Amino acid sequence: MTVSTSAPTVRIGSRKSQLALVQTYWVQEELQKHFPDRQFDVETMETQGDKILDVALAKIGDKGLFTQELEDGMLGKRTDLAVHSLKDLPTNLPAGLMLGCVTKRVNPADALVLNAKHQGKDLASLPEGAVIGTSSLRRLAQLRYHFPHLTFKDVRGNVNTRLAKLDSNEYDAIILAAAGLERLDMANRIDQLIPPEISLHAVGQGALGIECREGDQEILSLLKVLEDENSRDRCLAERAFLRQLEGGCQVPIGVNTHLDGDNLTLTGMVASLDGQRLIKDTLSAPRKEAEKLGQDLALKLREQGAGEILAEILAEAGRG
C-alpha cells in the first residue's frame, strides 16, 4: 500500500490594503486554478509605508517602504512568495530574493480624478490655483512642468482614503494609477487618462511583481503560469533604467515602453521638482537586450544632466 504525501501549503505574503488584497487574491485564484491539488494560503502583513501616513513619502525614504516586512517573511521561511505592485518593488532586492514573475500588465497610465464641482474638465482647463493631490514626486514634477497654473499638495492613504479626501473638498483633483482604480472596479472615477506626452508612468506601473526566494525551483515552476513575457521584457528595461540612475520610488523618474514584434522602445524622463527642467529621451533595441536598453538610456540621460538633477533632489531630501 502506498501512502500519498500531500505537497506543502504555499504561503503568499500580502499587504493589508484593499488593493493589495485584491491583487493577491487574484494571484491565489490563478494558482489554485492551475494547480487544484495544491493549497495556497494568504498571510497579510503591515509594512512601514502602511503605518506612516502623516509624512510625505519622499521624506521617509523608500528602501523597502512597502516591501521589507514581506521580504523578511520570505527570508524567515514564514511565506514562500509575495505579491507587489511592481512599481513599489525596489530595483535592488535583498540577498536571497528574486523577482520570480511579472504578470500581464494592465493600463500603466496615471489617471485624473476630479472633485464633482469640476466634472467635465481636464488638467489644462482646471482653474488657476486648483489644488491637485499627489504623493508622487514623478507626477508632481511632470505636471508642474506642463501646468504651472496648478497647485500641488501631498495626499497619503489608501485609494478609498484619498477619494474620501477629494470628495470632502480637500482637493480639486487627485492623481492615481489607473491600474489600481481598475482593479478596485472604480474605473468610473477616472475623468482623464493622462497621456505619456504629459506624464510618463512609474517604472513597473500596471504590472504585479511576484517576489520569491532565489533558486526556489518549486515556487518558480508554479509562477511560470502567471508570467507574461511582453510585460516582463518591458518592465526589465524600465527597472534597469531606474537602477542605473540609482533612483528609488520617490524620485521624479518616468518611463514608457512599447513593443513592436521583437523591437523594444523605451522612453525615459528625469525632472526637477520645481518643474523647470525636464530631460527626456528615447532608445530602441531588440527585446532580448531589454536590460542593456534600460542601462544605455540611463547613461544617455546622465550625459544630458539627469545626474545633477537627481543629486540635487537627494541632497535636498537629506539622503544624498
UniProtKB/Swiss-Prot annotation:
Matching PROSITE patterns: PORPHOBILINOGEN_DEAM
Single annotated GO MF: hydroxymethylbilane synthase activity
CDD domains: PBP2_HuPBGD_like
Keyword Transferase: yes
Annotated coiled-coil segments of the chain: none
Record key words, sorted: Chlorophyll biosynthesis, Porphyrin biosynthesis, Transferase
Cofactors demanded by this protein: dipyrromethane
Pathway: Porphyrin-containing compound metabolism; protoporphyrin-IX biosynthesis; coproporphyrinogen-III from 5-aminolevulinate: step 2/4; Porphyrin-containing compound metabolism; chlorophyll biosynthesis
Superkingdom classification of source: Bacteria
Keyword flag Cytoplasm: no
SUPFAM superfamilies: Periplasmic binding protein-like II, Porphobilinogen deaminase (hydroxymethylbilane synthase), C-terminal domain
Catalyzed reaction equations: 4 porphobilinogen + H2O = hydroxymethylbilane + 4 NH4(+)
GO CC, any one term: cytoplasm
Co-factor remark: Binds 1 dipyrromethane group covalently.
HAMAP family: Porphobil_deam
Miscellaneous comment in the UniProt entry for this protein: The porphobilinogen subunits are added to the dipyrromethane group.
Quaternary structure (record): Monomer.
Function: Tetrapolymerization of the monopyrrole PBG into the hydroxymethylbilane pre-uroporphyrinogen in several discrete steps.
Family indicated by similarity: Belongs to the HMBS family.
Identification of the protein by name: Porphobilinogen deaminase
Species of the source: Synechocystis sp. (strain ATCC 27184 / PCC 6803 / Kazusa)
Encoding gene, per UniProt annotation: hemC
